[in-house]
């Protein structure tokens, strides 16, 4: 009886493979083409990027929000397989101190693919930051067994596959 009350005894299925979807409408680009060496030289990790055509940013995977920067320009998500993704909206947007960004989530929230994360003003980002590009980076690469790009060029938020990850 206690096992049923507290959810014990449930067998949790271990997720080892996940598809990461685009967090925004726009154009998919290789991380090495991002005009910032921190991302292009993969100092933060492997990933991909999207040049957005709209300011609606959604969750690219099912998981838990583990970080939302106080400036609302970046979100960290831990997927069901334990992969930690950073969705970084724009380059040098930290200097905007949250201006032009609205967060729709908080740390600890559970998210599904397509759930709204952030809304941003792309025109303001173009004016005040160096780029609107959105890098999606795997922060704990040691947990990744393999990563296969989907080869998409046009991105639709929450629908277009960016890559498939197999966790170790």
Swiss-Prot record:
Transmembrane segments: none
Main location: cytoplasm
Alphabetically ordered keywords of this record: Cytoplasm, Kinase, Phosphotransferase system, Sugar transport, Transferase, Transport
Top-level taxonomic group: Bacteria
Domain PTS EIIA type-1: 36-140
Domain observations: The PTS EIIA type-1 domain is phosphorylated by phospho-HPr on a histidyl residue. Then, it transfers the phosphoryl group to the PTS EIIB type-1 domain.
Protein name according to UniProt: Phosphotransferase enzyme IIA component PtsA
Organism lineage string: Bacteria, Bacillati, Bacillota, Bacilli, Bacillales
Gene name of this polypeptide: ptsA
């Amino acid at each position: 009886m206690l096992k049923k009350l507290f959810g014990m005894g449930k067998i949790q299925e271990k997720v080892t493979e996940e598809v990461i979807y685009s967090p925004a409408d726009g154009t998919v680009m290789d991380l090495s083409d991002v005009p910032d060496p921190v991302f292009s030289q993969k100092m933060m990790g492997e990933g991909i990027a999207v040049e957005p055509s709209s300011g609606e940013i959604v969750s690219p995977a099912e998981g838990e929000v583990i970080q939302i920067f106080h400036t609302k320009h970046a979100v960290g998500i831990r997927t069901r397989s334990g992969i930690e993704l950073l969705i970084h909206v724009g380059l040098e947007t930290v200097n905007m101190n949250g201006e032009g960004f609205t967060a729709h989530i908080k740390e600890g929230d559970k998210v599904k693919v397509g759930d709204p994360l952030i809304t941003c003003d792309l025109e303001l980002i173009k004016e005040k930051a160096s780029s609107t590009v959105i890098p999606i980076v795997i922060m704990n690469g040691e947990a990744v067994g393999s990563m296969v790009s989907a080869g998409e060029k046009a991105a639709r938020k929450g629908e277009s596959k960016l890559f498939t990850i197999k966790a170790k």
